[in-house]
Amino acid sequence: VALFKPDPDRSIEDIVEDLGREIADRFRDAEDEAIAEVAARARRDMELAARLPEAAAGAGLTVAERREQNRILAELAATRARALADLARLGERLADGLRPADLAARLVALAALEGEAAAAASLGIGGRGLRPVPFTSTAGQAASMVAVSLENRLTNLRERITRYPRDAYQRIVAMYTPSTLLGITTSQVQQARIVQRFLAEGITGFVDRSGRRWTIGAYAEMAGRTSVARAYNDAGVWRMQQNGIQLGTISGGADACRKCAPWIGKILSFDGTTGDVVLPHATRDEPVTVHIDGTLAQARAAGWGHPNDRCKVNAYSPGLVIPQRDFEYDKQAEHERAEQRRLEREIRSAKRDLAAAMTDTDARRAARDVAKAQAEMRGFLKQTGRKRASYREQLHFADG
């Protein structure tokens, strides 16, 4: 049985970021390789198309030019047939390397073990001398449904990866029918830009329950981060309940969103209890009246624990100070976080345009866009004092 030593001192933010990034990287790398292979074949087609003879104004092709045209068109047809076969095999290979069932089970188990360890340490039943715990522990079992849900989502992404290389190339071939290649419709420069924009979009078409659209990298990251946070908190709550703790409080970042902010610092029950209750004081031999603001289920129903949320459920000790008890929603802080995410997407988008460029001119234009977006990010960080997360600006990161 695989062993893992959880660290109760790791923050949930770090755990969600690290494990979510692993999923995002895995699917983003597969997407990037697929796009690069399709782009290489599209560039080759363009180079062949550029060699097609063009008739002078008001005149037709000569016999020799007609033969050359037929030869190039035949070569295009042959290379396209080979490309379709190669790209079909590429899609299968990339999909085989993703292994969504193994990935989901491992990452959710890691998150659950971390959550249980953190809860145990906070209750004084853990400590720094934690022994390695097998994946078959109760924490992993408690998170099994979360793992199944994540596996189903990742399997859907895997199927899209399988089809994408061949489907994308066929879309590009449709853009380069013989009539367009012969200059009857769009110029070659315009055609190259159309292909570049299409490839830069990546694998799209993922829609969540709220109707929001995602790219494959963003969806993989969102699914991973959400499942990791849920497994972490569920395992922690399970450990608390096993030790007779039925109350908790939520902690979150200073830039928490409007859905989470109302619940940060509130006392919530795990068993449905609400209102005023009298409980033994955590450190003194006396009773204390505790006001329970709501239940964990109510918080989730109101939007807490939404996709990409990184809030944490902590055990509440009656009579002791509640961390973040007076927390207030900061609209400006949330706006700055959202703006940083937008700038990161702009940088990644420019880098994707650069990777998918069909011509040297387009590559130079995309490189200027990358530099411009990076300069805008530097100015924003200087103005707000926020920390830069350079890894989120890389192509292999998600778009969320």
Where are these regions (language model features)?
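N-terminal leader/targeting and assembly helices and adjacent pre-domain segments
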Residues: V1-L199, G319-L320, Q324-G400
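The feature marks a conserved, polyanion-engaging helical scaffold used by nucleic-acid processing enzymes
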Residues: Q191-R212, S227
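Acidic, glycine-rich two-metal-ion catalytic cores of nucleic acid-processing enzymes
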Residues: F206, W214-P318
